[in-house]
């Protein structure tokens, strides 16, 4: 049986990522309380560190997953270059989405300055002339009887801010190595505790950064004898704020479409509902970096002795 695609909008977990980010942040903000409640025992220092880093890593993954989810929905519903509106084909489009194609579209948004200008293009929807951005993020809010110039101006400014925010999300997402290190088997470890710069002659430490809240993952290098290591310092505040922003975008794609379908159970509940708007300044605040070092990248060259050890280990396995 093929379910009615309209049910998708009524039942979709539109707050999934926001809810997850909220409880992860709440636990991180009061770790001693939740350590006792969850584990029902006193954790030693290593266990506490593992718990804390697990939560931070989960928040980071949630951010990446929110971006991926948003763009899948965004492309599934986007009418640009199509001869039809796909609101009721959303399940088919999502099921037939191709990962590499989606990634390429996201990359174009990140790297092409004018990649989102199509959101300002006008389309004819029913009897209304609206922008594609209006259609995507404010579906149903375009009836002449309810649209004032002030409201239209607010929607236009909001769409302009959304374009600004989408560039940030796309840029964060296209560097896939970190997400894949979580997604395709856990290949990320808290290996680096500090980064220091010192005087070669005196061995005196001049600068030291605490990296105890960092996670490291390994990448292939062009040389078979090299290993590239990327270390990223956890930025809980940014991960949380950007996840909430992305979650709100998902909410806009789903919620306003749900209202246009006029489900009986919604008639009383949503007689009145708030219309929310995005702004560049609040998005920039979400995007603020709160750590001294974001990315630390270095390459290790394996020596002949390293390769001999590696060969010996491989022979024994």
Annotate each predicted stretch with a short phrase.
Residues 59, 63-65, 72:
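Alpha-helical protein-protein interaction scaffolds
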Residues 83-118:
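Hydrophobic/aromatic-rich structural module bridging two neighboring secondary-structure elements via a short loop
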Residues 69-87, 188-193:
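Short, solvent-exposed secondary-structure capping/transition elements
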């Amino acid at each position: 049986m093929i379910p009615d695609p309209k049910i998708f909008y009524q039942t979709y977990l539109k707050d999934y990522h926001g809810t997850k980010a909220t409880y992860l942040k709440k636990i991180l903000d009061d770790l001693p309380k939740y350590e006792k409640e969850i584990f029902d025992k006193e954790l030693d220092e290593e266990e506490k560190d593992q718990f804390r880093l697990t939560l931070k890593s989960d928040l980071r993954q949630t951010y990446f997953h929110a971006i991926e989810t948003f763009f899948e929905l965004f492309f599934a519903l986007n009418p640009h270059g199509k001869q039809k509106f796909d609101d009721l084909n959303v399940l088919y489009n999502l099921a037939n989405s191709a990962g590499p194609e989606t990634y390429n579209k996201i990359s174009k948004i990140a790297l092409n300055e004018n990649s989102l200008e199509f959101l300002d293009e006008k389309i004819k929807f029913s009897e209304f002339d609206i922008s594609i951005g209006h259609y995507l993020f404010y579906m149903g809010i375009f009836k002449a009887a309810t649209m004032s110039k002030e409201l239209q101006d607010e929607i236009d400014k909001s769409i302009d801010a959304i374009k600004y925010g989408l560039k940030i999300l796309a840029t964060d997402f296209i560097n896939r190595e970190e997400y894949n290190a979580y997604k395709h088997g856990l290949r990320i470890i808290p290996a680096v505790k500090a980064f220091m710069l010192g005087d070669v002659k005196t061995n005196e430490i001049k600068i030291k950064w605490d990296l105890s809240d960092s996670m490291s993952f390994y990448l292939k290098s062009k040389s078979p004898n090299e290993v590239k290591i990327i270390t990223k310092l956890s930025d809980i505040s940014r991960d949380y704020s950007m996840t909430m922003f992305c979650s709100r975008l998902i909410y806009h794609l789903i919620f306003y479409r749900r209202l246009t379908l006029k489900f009986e159970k919604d008639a009383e509940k949503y007689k009145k509902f708030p219309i929310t708007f995005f702004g560049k300044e609040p998005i920039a605040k979400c995007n603020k970096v709160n750590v001294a070092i974001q990315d630390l990248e270095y390459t290790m060259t394996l020596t002949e002795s390293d390769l001999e050890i590696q060969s010996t280990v491989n022979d024994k396995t």
